[in-house]
Amino acid sequence: RHSDRIMLFGSCFAENIGNLLLANKFRCDVNPFGILYNPLSIVEALWQILSHQTYTEEDLFYAGGCWHSWMHHSVFSASTAASCLSSINTRLEQASAGLPQLDWLVITWGTAFAYWLKERTMVVGNCHKQPDSLFTRQLLTVEEIVTEWECVLVELRKVNPFLKILFTVSPCLLYTSPSPRDTERS
């Protein structure tokens, strides 16, 4: 229904569907962290929304003339830390404020591969074209995904007991995958 409030999270598929819904006058919040592909990055983003986290300059890094967040898509990157933080924190505040009123949360997973920043042992939402040596690549198990999602779903239900959650899988292919088998497993 056009009156439903919808938040979409995930891959470029979620982004495209969300933009199509917006163009047709649905009430949507599309990818508050920008495009995210793996289930753990999306869980981390939801935890940050649930906890009303505010980003500081310590959460950013500078590379290639821009400030970036490991958890956000490059649409949030900016030439100054202040501008980057303003974009990130504004979207976080909007998502946190809107969560209790949502009717639908649509989650689209694009891959079961996650990347961990070695230096901080954290899952990242975006590698921002940084050297491979900074990251550990991991194929998530079903058990890991289920465990993380069970916890965040419990918290989401506390904030919004009537929230309907739709999980989808992105129809994308991993063209840059080292092997066709990786695409299949992912």
Mark where each language-model region is.
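Basic, amphipathic N-terminal segments that precede the first structured/catalytic domain
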Residues: D4-M7, F13-G98
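Structural motif
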Residues: R5, W104-V106, K164
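Short beta-strand segments
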Residues: G10, V106-G110, T168
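Short amphipathic alpha-helices and their capping/turn segments at secondary-structure boundaries
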Residues: I88-L105, C151-V159
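Short, solvent-exposed beta-strand-terminating loops
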Residues: W109-R120
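Active-site segments of SGNH/GDSL-like serine hydrolases
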Residues: A112, V154-S177
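A solvent-exposed, charged loop/short amphipathic helix patch at secondary-structure junctions
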Residues: K118-V142
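Single conserved hydrophobic/aromatic residue that forms the stacking wall/gate
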Residues: Y175-S186
